[in-house]
């Protein structure tokens, strides 16, 4: 939210909900991994350096973002919401109309990566993606630092 208000104030409200909901499908994929007896293989792949998305795709032929979009489509939620989330794991597939929004979600997802949210490594990855997408990385870095400081103050 700190970063979005600087990147594109008009998108701030529009992206807040997808940013919070984009990992919804992870619960279903975790259950599917368990049902198929693939949990240990999944953990091994991630521990060996595969991203969660790479391991999901390899073992289940889909990713959290794709499943989340399918769930939301089934529930007949907003196409805007669905289209922002659906290609977060492969931004190049996003329609032009949703590309910037999907890129923003990708940067947020990378920085707040479920395995180690706001770790130095994930922050660097997020900054690199932001740079590739043409976003102001200084503003992003400042927003992340502010968020990290706030989280430390809560401990």
Task: Please provide the spans of the model-predicted regions.
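Metal-dependent nucleotide-binding catalytic modules
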Residues: 9-10, 14-155
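Hydrophobic, well-ordered beta-alpha structural blocks that scaffold small-molecule cofactor pockets
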Residues: 1-2, 11
